[in-house]
Amino acid sequence: MSANNNMESEIKEIESISFGMMSSEDIRQMSSFEVKTAKISSTNLLETVHDPKSGPIGSAPCETCHQNEWDCPGHFGHIELNVPIIHPLFINHVVNILKIFCWKCNEFLLTKDHLELNNILKLEKEKKFNAVLEKIKKCDRCVHCTTPRADYKLVLNDITYKTIYRTFSYQGGAVKTARDKKLNESREIVSAEMVKKIFDNIKLEYVEMLGISHPKDFCLEVFPVIPSCCRPHEVQDGNINDDDLTYQLMEIVKNNSMIGAIKLEKESMEKQYPECLKVKEILLLSNVEKQKKEIDDFLKKPIKNGLKTKKKINKEEITPLDQYLKLHDKYVKYVNNLKFRIETYCNNSQGKATHATTGRAIKGLRERLTGKEGQIRNNLLGKRCEMSARTVIGPDPTLKIDEVIVPKEIAQSLTFPDFVNKHNIDRLTKLVNSGNAIRLVKKNESGQEIKINLAAAINNHGTPLQHDDIIKRPKITNNHEEKHNYEEKHNFDTFETIVIKDPKNFVLKEGDILFRNNFQQKVVLPSKKFIKLEEGWIVHRYLQNGDILVLNRQPTLHKASMMALRVKIMDVKTFKFNLACTKPYNADFDGDEMNAHAPQSEESKAELFTLSTPKQCIMSCQSGKPNLTIVQDSLTGAYLMSKENNNDATLTNGEFNDILMVLTQNDEYNGDVVDYFLKRKEDVSNTLKKLGFSGTVLNGKGLLSLLFPNDLYINEEDLKINRGVIYDGCLTKKYLSSTESSLIKILYKEYGVETCATFLNNIQFLTNRWLMISSFSIHAGDCIKQKEVLGTVEQCLMESEKIKMTTQNPFIREQKIMQTLSNAKDVGMKIAKDALKRDNVNLHAQNNFLTTVESGSKGDHLNIAQITSLLGQQITEGQRVKPLLSNGKRTLPHYILKEENNDTEHFHDLLEEYESQGFISSSFAQGLNPKEFFFHCMAGRQGVCDTAMSTATSGYIMRRNVKLTEDIKVAYDGTVQDTRGRRFQMAYGELGYDPSKLVKVNGKPEVCNIARLVNKLNCNFEDNIK
């Protein structure tokens, strides 16, 4: 007990985390074992990568902490490297640090005074270091020893490892001495030993002044070995395979051991042949060209002690000098291999390291931690759950906003635990015995839970049949039910003989006699057992109509990305829901998939029904505008219906009642639905007569008026409603979408959630049914190009030519030309818009392109201009397309190379000149030629790239924000605090208002619009007096 108490008392709260490099001593102190050999035997695993001190192997306890595999956290080991290695992840930092220190005296190239004069020391850590790097570039020599400054570059050699090269150069190219000239022409390799020597001599005061940690730890002398639990072996086809990291560690140990053995052999030769020391000095030269030259000179000189005499070494006739050089080549090879293995152990994102047998790329530490499939996002931040499903989504205009169609396959996979009580015991008993439940849970006398598989408990499959069993069945005339299950059938007295070829699908019947190997067998017919439930048992039943299901589309950015919908089971393959719910999900039906989650308790169902149904998500909690809106077909239908004249009867009485019938299936009205609409129809007719109309309701406006409350008043320029009756204006996106003046918001705020939800359902049912009578489509006649456009293009091009001749400054000239050419698109848009409206008036026909734009259901006037007029100037990187071919004289090879001063006399030549820089005079209806298509793709490509980049950036920011604020909540006292009780706000948003319940009055958020409520009361009072 005392040990446990001591352990508990030592546990403290983490205050901060710091990241940095571990020194060699830190790694040794942390290590529980040293890996010395790559050879593994079944009897001895000590000092290998599978050392028992790294953690338990199988059922054996850990030899370090003596815990089992569940409790042991794992223990690090280490490898003593026989040669220092620059840490591959920090090699760029190493190069930058080398640049600011002298390569000869290892002092800082500048003085502290230099930094103080330029106010560099006052900067933050990273900014300070970058400023020092920029300052060093202007320095030629070390201020301490006057040695020329060296420049360092990182070069990738043989696509496997990186090498640091050192060169000497001077600002302005001035060479001062013979030594300087010699250095200036050299290019040296900087080895890890040289880097370590420089870093070891760097004074601590310089490190503190620069605000960095000491760089000596960037040179690895000891390599850590992660615990075995972090690199578990995997079993495939009965074979045990080592993890990728274990494979890499074994390769590191192999190469390290070979380096150690070669070093010992070289030292032995240096003792035996002292002249080898001279060769060693030459081989250590960092200048490759100088090294080759001195080796050649050394080989030409006469050498004593038999260094050039051939001897039998390792069964090979070779001179000791050649053997020594051969050992050096092997040494360099294994050092490079060691660098490569350590680099790919840390980061193998480019797939350089592969398995020798399979060729599969090895997963390094970086790949395991970072990215979508890494440990952090996939495991630590990942959300995994049972009772969920995923499939493609689609629309269904017959559904209400709070309903979802679920495929039958999914409904028979997801379950809900129902507790048996006196109120539901009969219903659940029927479900269990009809095969609509999967599992039964009850408790025995000792209180232990017993799980019963209902399929096995209810169904008795009878005698198991085998292939070639013989069944004798009483002969039944004209019964071919089992004909497909047997191949041989012979009449035998009053029986028919059946040879079973498909035992799984054959069903025994009463009177069957079974023979197996000429012996009669006992026949037990298939039967079902009746299960009687008791109170307190738990029935895991399949989903049923009316159940709650949470539907989610990723990315989940706000509350309404997960909404609770009521289930309707159908024999389909996709989820289907109402189109009004597409906006909060940001969903479309071009192949999008969504997730469904089945709640597993009555409490969670109640919480979802109270907080997360579409009715509770109608208004956005961020902007206060409607989340659920009328879109596309329904919006077009509402616009066309409200555009009809109040005095015209465009529908027969039968058609009117037929359309009205779709509303009577709605059970959300109080009282008799039919009586409600008959009374409402009479009220609408009376209101129209008072307003000076004929009083007919047999048109679109009359139908729509039935949906509004009888005390709704709207008095806008483009829409007027009196006592819930539309008598002027049209319903457009402004009034049925996500705007401040939306009717959805007004109904939600003034009449409540239920009235608003009923309106959203009914207006979609009504408009969709009306469109079945009054069809709507777009045809080729709506896309005719206007003749006036050609004159506009010519006028804009001529203006551009005038600007080109009169403006001298090239920058100003280009900006004016761009503005003039962009005007062509605006003028084309105006021409298209006016022409379409003019055609509507003259021909008394509706251009359906214009209808979709004016209603707001799809597109805008710019889209119409692009289809019927011209696309205009294409912009890439904020300017016209640059001529990059033929020394900057043309943009594409399709255009003829012309002289710079060549004047264009004809319009065709002028058009081609501007077309070559991205001006498109064609429309989509006319079609783009190949050259125009190139330019159009150039402009579109930039938008695609920007979208992809911004999506990744915003997603990363969102993940960080969610993680940082995941425990912040509004407490019961109204304050905003986290789980530790730290308060961030005394009231949410400083005011404590819910944005979804506010309205904007003159641009300011208010609890309610007093002027509107007063006007409503006055209108009601005046109508009652009349």
Swiss-Prot record:
Enzyme class (EC, first level): transferase
InterPro entries: DNA-dir_RpoC_beta_prime, RNA_pol_asu, RNA_pol_N, RNA_pol_Rpb1_1, RNA_pol_Rpb1_3, RNA_pol_Rpb1_3_sf, RNA_pol_Rpb1_4, RNA_pol_Rpb1_5
Domain of life assignment: Viruses
GO cellular component terms attached to this protein's record: DNA-directed RNA polymerase complex
One GO-annotated biological process of the protein: DNA-templated transcription
Protein residues bound to Mg(2+): D588, D590, D592
Coiled coil: none
Residues where Zn(2+) 1 binds: C62, C65, C72, H75
A Pfam family it matches: RNA_pol_Rpb1_1
Entry's EC annotation: 2.7.7.6
GO molecular function: DNA binding; DNA-directed RNA polymerase activity; metal ion binding
Reactions mediated catalytically: RNA(n) + a ribonucleoside 5'-triphosphate = RNA(n+1) + diphosphate
Assigned protein family: Belongs to the RNA polymerase beta' chain family.
Functional summary from the UniProt entry: Component of the DNA-dependent RNA polymerase that catalyzes the transcription of DNA into RNA using the four ribonucleoside triphosphates as substrates. Largest and catalytic component of RNA polymerase II which synthesizes mRNA precursors and many functional non-coding RNAs. Forms the polymerase active center together with the second largest subunit.
Name by which UniProt lists this protein: Probable DNA-directed RNA polymerase II subunit RPB1 homolog
